[in-house]
C-alpha cells in the first residue's frame, strides 16, 4: 500500500484507504476503479461510528465562504488522492464549482440539494471568461446516497444544505482538492479562480505548488 497521512485514526478509515490503494494498483482504468470502489465506499458512508466530532464542525474562515469546512481525513504521499469531509451549514449554498478530478462523493449526514451544470467551454477556463452554462438536473441527496465524478462531463455543480443540521459529504478525489487552483462560476457564467483550502492543513504557498 502507498504511504500517506491520516488525520483520523479510526479503523474504518484505515481499512477503506487500504482497499482504495489495492484497487488503484490493480486497475489502471478509471471506470473499473470507480466500479470496484462503490461497495467499500458505501460501507464507509453507512458507518456512523468513525467520524470524530471535530471533523463535523463548520469553518468561519473557509475558502469557499459561508462557514463551509473542508476537513482532510487522508492524503496520499504524492497528493494524488484525498479523502475529506465537506461540512455545509444549514441553508448555505456552495459556489458553483468544479473539482478537476475523478472520484466519489456521498452524503454522510443531513440532506443536500445538488444542482449539476453542463459547461460548454470546459477545457479552457480563464478568470473573467464568460461561459455558457445549462442546468442538467436538480436532486435531493440523503445519507448513504453517492455519485461519481468524471471530469469534464459531470464536474460542475453546487450543493445546498436543506436539513436543519449541517450536511456532511465525504469526498474521495484523485487530487489535492483543497490546494489546487479550481474554478467557480457566478449565475451568469463568469469564471473566477479559487482555492478552497483545508480546514486542518495549510496549503503550499509557492506558485509552483498551486496547480
Language-model segments: which ranges?
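N-terminal leader/capping segments at the start of a protein or of a new domain
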Residues: 1-50
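Glycine- and acidic-residue-biased ligand/ion/polar-headgroup-sensing regions
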Residues: 101-120
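Long hydrophobic alpha-helical segments typical of transmembrane helices together
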Residues: 185-211
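Conserved short histidine dyad/triad with adjacent acidic residue
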Residues: 84-98, 150-154
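Ligand-binding loop in jelly-roll beta-barrel domains
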Residues: 151-170
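A short hydrophobic beta-strand segment most commonly corresponding to one strand
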Residues: 104-106, 164-179
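Short acidic-glycine-tyrosine-enriched beta hairpin
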Residues: 118-156, 195-199
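A short glycine-rich, His/Asp/Glu-containing loop-to-beta-strand
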Residues: 62-90
Amino acid at each position: 500500500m502507498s504511504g500517506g497521512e491520516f488525520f483520523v485514526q479510526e479503523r474504518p478509515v484505515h481499512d477503506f484507504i487500504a482497499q482504495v490503494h489495492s484497487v488503484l494498483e490493480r486497475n489502471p482504468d478509471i471506470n473499473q476503479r470507480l466500479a470496484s470502489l462503490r461497495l467499500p465506499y458505501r460501507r464507509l458512508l453507512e458507518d456512523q461510528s468513525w467520524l470524530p466530532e471535530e471533523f463535523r464542525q463548520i469553518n468561519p474562515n473557509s475558502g469557499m465562504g459561508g462557514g463551509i469546512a473542508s476537513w482532510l481525513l487522508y492524503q496520499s504521499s504524492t497528493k494524488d488522492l484525498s479523502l475529506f469531509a465537506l461540512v455545509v451549514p444549514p441553508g448555505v449554498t456552495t459556489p458553483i464549482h468544479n473539482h478537476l478530478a475523478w472520484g466519489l462523493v456521498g452524503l454522510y449526514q443531513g440532506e443536500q440539494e445538488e444542482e449539476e451544470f453542463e459547461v460548454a467551454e470546459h477545457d479552457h477556463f480563464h478568470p473573467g471568461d464568460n461561459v455558457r452554462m445549462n442546468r442538467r438536473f436538480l436532486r435531493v441527496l440523503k445519507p448513504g446516497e453517492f455519485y461519481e465524478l468524471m471530469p469534464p462531463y459531470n464536474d460542475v455543480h453546487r450543493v445546498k444544505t436543506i436539513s436543519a443540521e449541517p450536511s456532511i459529504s465525504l469526498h474521495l478525489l484523485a487530487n489535492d482538492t483543497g490546494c489546487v487552483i479550481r474554478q467557480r462560476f457566478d449565475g451568469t457564467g463568469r469564471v473566477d479562480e479559487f482555492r478552497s483550502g483545508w480546514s486542518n492543513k495549510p496549503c503550499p504557498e509557492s506558485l509552483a505548488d498551486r496547480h
